[in-house]
């Protein structure tokens, strides 16, 4: 979509006129200040289901002022039988929002950006890690095996910049950019933090 109300309305009108209607299924939604972040399944005019993360910023009048998103095709269950959207739960630990945001910020710096990889085990509870990435199995071992497999193919997953870290309770969404296999890539990672440890992960 282009910037501005008219560009957005024009795009919506185009979708509305398509022979096959667009469907939207919201999976989960969270709030952080003037921003709302959501996980949603779209099917634009019958083109196939896509899993998305959307971020909306609202202005002082409660109107949508800005939007970011990232989408990927809906895939089959991963090696642990999990999907990109399952395991919904109500948000918890609202009093720990800022502490959980800090856990994820530190994890991004130390692990995902590779500044202190030796700290990786300390971010998990005895290696337990529920994984919804389409190609990675559960556990810290599953993550390590997937990264090793990519390395053998000469593919690097690099995080260069973290743009936003949004949080509500135990749910934290990070918006980052870098490269995957040398190609510029946007990373949207949703983590659930439990007792100060990274417990679960969804991404696009």
Specify the residue positions occupied by each region the protein language model found.
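C-terminal and inter-domain tail/linker signature
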Residues: 1-204
């Amino acid at each position: 979509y282009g910037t501005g109300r008219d560009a957005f309305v024009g795009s919506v009108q185009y979708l509305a006129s398509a022979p096959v209607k667009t469907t939207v299924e919201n999976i989960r939604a969270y709030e952080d200040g003037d921003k709302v972040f959501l996980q949603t399944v779209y099917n634009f005019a019958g083109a196939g289901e896509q899993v998305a993360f959307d971020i909306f910023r609202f202005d002082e009048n409660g109107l949508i002022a800005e939007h970011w998103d990232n989408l990927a095709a809906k895939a089959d269950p991963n090696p642990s039988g999990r999907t990109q959207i399952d395991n919904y739960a109500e948000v918890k630990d609202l009093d720990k929002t800022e502490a959980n945001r800090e856990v994820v910020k530190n994890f991004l710096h130390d692990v995902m950006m590779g500044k202190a990889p030796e700290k990786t085990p300390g971010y998990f509870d005895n290696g337990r890690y529920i994984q919804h990435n389409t190609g990675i199995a559960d556990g810290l071992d599953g993550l390590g095996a997937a990264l090793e497999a990519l390395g053998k193919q000469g593919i690097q997953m690099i995080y260069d910049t973290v743009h936003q870290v949004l949080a509500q309770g135990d749910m934290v969404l990070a918006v980052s950019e870098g490269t995957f296999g040398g190609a510029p890539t946007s990373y949207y990672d949703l983590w659930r933090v439990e007792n100060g440890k990274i417990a679960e992960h969804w991404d696009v």
